[in-house]
């Protein structure tokens, strides 16, 4: 699902909006994140399953992925592994409502960019996305 209101307008400088992908099986969480990013220069696409998110990543160049760890079917940790094999530089911000030290360490070992525990502060999420986009810019310049 693409949020066309966000994708219809370019940034103030006239350039394309940065594409971000949000994957969470909870429609309210997806909408909350889309709304939190509405004032940012991002075009936000959404997916409700990891498989759908992976397919989108294979077709579209994203600047960051916001991913729930607990998803039906293919789980978040497995999805991170697949995504990293396809695009190792894509910054992944994970969210979970089932936090534990072991889960956080597994996510960090898989190569995530940022770890959020639900419920989280939306300002923290927005700051993490901004940092992820800057990180992506730096890694692209070095490549």
Please identify what each model-predicted range represents:
Residues 55, 77-89:
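Short amphipathic alpha-helix used as the core "switch/output" element in two-component signaling
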Residues 27-45:
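Two-component/phosphorelay signaling modules centered on CheY-like receiver
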Residues 102, 120-130:
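C-terminal output helix
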Residues 86, 98-99:
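Short, conserved "switch-loop" micro-motifs in signal-transduction and mechanochemical regulators
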Residues 78, 99-114:
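Alpha4 helix (beta4-alpha4-beta5 surface) of REC/receiver domains from two-component response regulators
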């Amino acid at each position: 699902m693409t949020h066309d209101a966000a994708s219809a307008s370019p940034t103030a400088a006239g350039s394309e909006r940065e594409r971000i992908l949000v994957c969470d099986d909870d429609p309210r969480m997806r909408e909350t994140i889309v709304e939190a990013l509405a004032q940012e220069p991002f075009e936000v696409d959404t997916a409700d399953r990891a498989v759908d998110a992976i397919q989108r990543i294979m077709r579209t160049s994203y600047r960051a992925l916001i991913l729930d760890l607990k998803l039906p079917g293919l789980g978040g940790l497995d999805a991170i592994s697949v995504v990293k094999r396809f695009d190792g530089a894509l910054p992944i911000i994970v969210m979970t409502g089932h936090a534990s030290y072991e889960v956080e360490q597994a996510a960090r070992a898989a190569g995530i960019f940022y770890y959020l525990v639900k419920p989280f502060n939306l300002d923290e999420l927005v700051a993490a996305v901004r940092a992820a986009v800057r990180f992506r810019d730096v890694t692209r310049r070095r490549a």
